[in-house]
Amino acid sequence: MESLLSIRGLNVEFQTPSGPLHVLRDINIDVPRGKILGIVGESGSGKSTVIWAINRLLASNGAINGGTATFDGQDLLALNDRQMLSVRGEQISMVFQDPMTSQIPVLTYDRQMSDIQYRRKELSMKDKRERAIRIMHKVGIPDPEDRILQYPHHFSGGMRQRAGIAMALLMDPLLLIADEPTTALDVTLEAQIIHLIQELRAEFDATIMVVSHNLGLIAELCDQVVVMYAGEVVEYGSVSNLFYEPAHPYTQALLNCDPARTQTKTRYLPVIPGDVPDLHVLPTGCIFAARCSQVMEQCKTTSPAKVQLDGSQHVASCHLLDPGLQASGDSPKNASPQGDVSGKVRPKPSVESEELLKVEDLCVRFQTNSWIRSKIQKRPRFVDAVIDASLSLRQGETLGLVGESGSGKTTLGRAILGLVQAESGSVIFDGQELRDLSRAGLSQLRRNMAMMFQDPVGSLSPRQTVRSLITEPFQIHRINADLDEEAARLCEMVRLPQDFLSRYPHELSGGQARRVGVARALALNPQIIIADEPTAGLDVSVQGEILNLMNELQETHGLSYLIISHNLPVIRHVSDRLAIMYLGRLVEFGDSDEIFSQPAHPYTQALVNGVPQPDPNRRRSLVSIEGEVPSLANRPAGCEFHTRCKYATADCRNMRPPLSQIRVNGLDREVACHYPLVGESGEQ
């Protein structure tokens, strides 16, 4: 199989105040023509550094210390800067992780796409615009003639990513590189982008590299997969090899950690113990030895050689695969699979558990024009972010709240805590109506309800130490306590070493910052924690650690959780009941297991079907939901989902369905649909 890009012996170092950082070591990767290659691994494994190195875009303190990167017959590492200008953008194009920061906010797409084509002197401005419009149409952007004149902030997240793909395709590149192309997207938009990449590959016979920590995305898209750990390639093979016959313990561990593969939600998620090693001082022997459940003495002293398996292109670096070792019988006996935690279960709360929180007909409205403009225009303009939301939370229960961006999930969570003022409705906690409480009474009640914010680093003051951050609630509520003692207690609860108390947020990893957020939320021993995207941006193993910690704290302290997320595998694993929101309204509410196995609302069905599975044989053939979420300022008449629903009828277009009770498999459920997909009143 001919390779478009062949990387051999690539080594990259970064100079830091602590000495050289050995980021990439002896990297060998082949990207076959017309194929999609995936690169996976935890944060810090070197995935993105490979991409920046072959594009010669390393930071000023980075250096390539050896190796070659042969692309279409020329070594990219031997080219000078002027020669590389004709490669970047023209022969190799990038789709970046965050289109909002990679696109220029003060330039229209017309201007940005014209600038990208600056080397095509033979094209007039009109020709460049027409070409850009054709590409925008190709990637599924509606009305490209009009939308090319708009700015990035006028586009939704999914449309911005489509525009980013259009920009990458403008110069007909030989190689398209997508760096975490769906990380910030909802499951429905993720499905659309995956479908688009598949179409581009089929139509243009494109060669694509995908960098991601999303195993479902890799299984859905890729032909070949490279697994990286701490700057080394530990396994390489076909997507079937990697998902069905993983040879390296690290690959096995990554797969076991994925909640989408853990069907029994009452189990604690498997995790990979320990942390990625410090690349300033490399350990002797196997780079993964310190975290491996199948480690041998040989692993600690000798680096493993690459072993080709079954005479195929499946290659892994592990002593366990050494034929000589297997023949001598020195391999470990009865070693549990990497990351296995079988037997650990989380009990499900009884349906008779005390109802701790009750939300009734809650509405939240935001003014969209400024106070001055509203006076000039004689009337303010409003959008309804949450409409008539009603739900309950029992003692010791986990309630999942899901929906696309803009559905009102976070606004509802903040309104429950009183962080956002509700227009109408009620929030009753432990028999007390929050609206009836004085400021002092509300402050007292807030000790029993805490919030974990979506961005753990952004929500922590960069000027405060961990000790100050996790003990601040005592000072806010004027509670006399030994702060040193409380800080030590909270660190122990969330398993943070005591020496972390003197660190600042920028010195923490994503998982460590998340633990600080959990500790801060637990400071005053609340009964309810509202967790907004508690695993967003985390690797699957770190994600498992945070979820296991939350489960353990729930068992120990009887906590109730309202978990807001668009990560459906996570929600399926942790939630007892589930609420689905669309355009500010609840459209389905009931038992989590039942909803995931038999969704009643078409929107819920589309969300569940849209989750990419870490199984190459379960690739989707259709996009789960077409179209964009309507604007809150211009809601559709009737059922608000009818503009995207494949089951919509005239009734759906004219009448809004109320949230009504149905019965499915003997359990009550609420659904807002004229024709529920399941249930006694609408069984299909």
Question: Where do the language-model regions lie?
Answer:
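ABC ATPase NBD coupling module
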Residues: 76-93, 119, 241-246, 277-283, ...
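Conserved ABC transporter NBD signature motif
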Residues: 63-75, 425-433, 445
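A short, proline-enriched helix->beta-strand linker immediately N-terminal to the Walker B motif
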Residues: 170-174, 523-527
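Conserved ABC ATPase signature
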Residues: 150-155, 159, 504-508, 512
